[in-house]
């Protein structure tokens, strides 16, 4: 049996780039909660002792941007300079303007147009991916890397590993074989964790705690063997972290946000963007399409692409590839997809209820992945049953 290695990485919520994603989406949530028609393009950057929010926002909402920044940083765990940022005393800079009237007139008309008439907020192409290798219909390498990051945060916040600090990165290499186009995991080849820690803990304590409290609860035993390699804080020291260690910027972790390097990516980031931005809404609808294809048994693995022109409601193209795992030809799967999914941006917002704010809805997406999550707010993860002729197949 010929196998290959594939690696996916993740970062947890204290990573500077992810801090910025969370601030941007917290701003989006606040705007949508008061005004579902808010037009939001919110970027965030951070460095030592400073967080800045900037961009274009047109909303009727009354939003305290500085308070959102401080609350978000505090909830992550940035409560002192020692851990990388002091949420209550850092500098907060705000430079928010209204959306360009050129873009607004060419795209939205959202107060007068019907949802099906609303044009795309920009050009671009987005990809959705699904695979039957995990219950989430997501790649195993990505799922494990993401869950390790989430577990790091959990044991930090609940006090199990009190020496942990907010910043951290994970990476998992999985050995696969290709089963006629379907990806079949064989074993976990390598686990890498680099996590920020306090001054008191030893490297041996770090390694022991990570194996016991992070790796063991996350990675199923069947994937681990005596040959599995563990790199646990291999640099030897990671005390300085968060924005004090590295600058951060919204939209710098787009592969972590999606499929861990599997499938494809059109390049557009998600966080801080309202649903008229097809970078986000387009990626959500093609994930639902790909997931529904696999869940309905049409294919074991597939990718769906959609593309748009600014101001035009109808997509320019829709593409499906089942990697040879389809039970029926890809052209037939594409026909089913077009019959069951409405790719017009206004209708995506309606069908996935994307204008609904509150409950930290989009903030939740900004760490630990936008896909493969069991949460009623992740409406794009709801499988749409697809009818097809199994006898003919």
Swiss-Prot record:
**Protein residues bound to L-methionine:** 56, 99, 246, 277
Role according to the record = Catalyzes the formation of S-adenosylmethionine from methionine and ATP. The reaction comprises two steps that are both catalyzed by the same enzyme: formation of S-adenosylmethionine (AdoMet) and triphosphate, and subsequent hydrolysis of the triphosphate.
The entry's protein name is S-adenosylmethionine synthase
> What is its pathway?
Amino-acid biosynthesis; S-adenosyl-L-methionine biosynthesis; S-adenosyl-L-methionine from L-methionine: step 1/1
Its ancestry begins with: Eukaryota, Viridiplantae, Streptophyta, Embryophyta, Tracheophyta
**Which HAMAP family does this UniProt record tie to the protein?**
S_AdoMet_synth1
Where's it mainly located?
cytoplasm
Q: How does it assemble?
A: Homotetramer.
Kindly list the cofactors needed.
Mn(2+); Mg(2+); Co(2+); K(+)
Q: Which GO terms describe its cellular component?
A: cytoplasm
Origin organism is Litchi chinensis (Lychee)
Q: Report the family membership.
A: Belongs to the AdoMet synthase family.
This protein's UniProt keywords: ATP-binding, Cobalt, Cytoplasm, Magnesium, Metal-binding, Nucleotide-binding, One-carbon metabolism, Potassium, Transferase
**Cofactor annotation comment:** Binds 2 divalent ions per subunit. The metal ions interact primarily with the substrate. Can utilize magnesium, manganese or cobalt (in vitro). Binds 1 potassium ion per subunit. The potassium ion interacts primarily with the substrate.
Q: Which NCBIfam families match?
A: metK
Chain positions recorded as Mg(2+) binding sites: 9
**What are the binding positions for ATP in this chain?**
15, 167-169, 235-238, 246, 252-253, 269, 273, 277
Give this protein's Gene Ontology molecular function annotations: ATP binding; metal ion binding; methionine adenosyltransferase activity
Q: Where does K(+) bind?
A: 43
Catalysis: reaction(s): L-methionine + ATP + H2O = S-adenosyl-L-methionine + phosphate + diphosphate
Q: Name the gene that codes for it.
A: SAMS
Tell me one GO biological process term: one-carbon metabolic process
Subcellular localization is given as: Cytoplasm
């Amino acid at each position: 049996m010929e196998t290959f290695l594939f690696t996916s990485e993740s970062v947890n919520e204290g990573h500077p780039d992810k801090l910025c994603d969370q601030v941007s989406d917290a701003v989006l949530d606040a705007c949508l909660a008061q005004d579902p028609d808010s037009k939001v393009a919110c970027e965030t950057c951070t460095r030592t002792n400073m967080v800045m929010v900037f961009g274009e926002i047109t909303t009727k909402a009354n939003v305290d941007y500085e308070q959102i920044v401080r609350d978000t940083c505090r909830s992550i765990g940035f409560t002192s300079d020692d851990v990388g940022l002091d949420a209550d005393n850092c500098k907060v800079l705000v430079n928010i303007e209204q959306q360009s009237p050129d873009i607004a007139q060419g795209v939205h008309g959202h107060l007068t147009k019907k949802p099906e008439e609303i044009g795309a907020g920009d050009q671009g192409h987005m990809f959705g991916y699904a695979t039957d290798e995990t219950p989430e219909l997501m790649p195993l390498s990505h799922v494990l890397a993401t869950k390790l990051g989430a577990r790091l945060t959990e044991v930090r916040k609940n006090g199990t590993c009190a020496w942990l600090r907010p910043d951290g990165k994970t990476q998992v290499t999985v050995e696969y074989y290709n089963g006629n186009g379907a990806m079949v995991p064989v074993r976990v080849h390598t686990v890498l964790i680099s996590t920020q820690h306090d001054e008191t803990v030893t490297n041996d304590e770090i390694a022991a705690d990570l194996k016991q409290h992070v790796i063991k609860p996350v990675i199923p035993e069947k994937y681990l063997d005596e040959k599995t390699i563990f790199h646990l804080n291999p640099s030897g020291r990671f005390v300085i972290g968060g924005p004090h260690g590295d600058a951060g910027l919204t939209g710098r972790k787009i592969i972590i946000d999606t499929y861990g390097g599997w499938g494809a990516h059109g390049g557009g980031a998600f966080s801080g963007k309202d649903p008229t931005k097809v970078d986000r809404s387009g990626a959500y609808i093609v994930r639902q399409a790909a997931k529904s294809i696999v869940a309905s048994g049409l294919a074991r693995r597939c990718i769906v692409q959609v593309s748009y022109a600014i101001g035009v409601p109808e997509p320019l193209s829709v593409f499906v590839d089942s990697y040879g795992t389809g039970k029926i030809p890809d052209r037939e799967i594409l026909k089913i997809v077009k019959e069951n999914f409405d790719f017009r941006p206004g209708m995506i917002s309606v069908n996935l209820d994307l204008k609904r704010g509150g409950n930290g809805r989009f903030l939740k997406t900004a760490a630990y992945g936008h896909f493969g999550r069991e949460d009623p707010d992740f409406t794009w993860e709801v499988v749409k049953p697809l009818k097809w002729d199994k006898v003919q197949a």
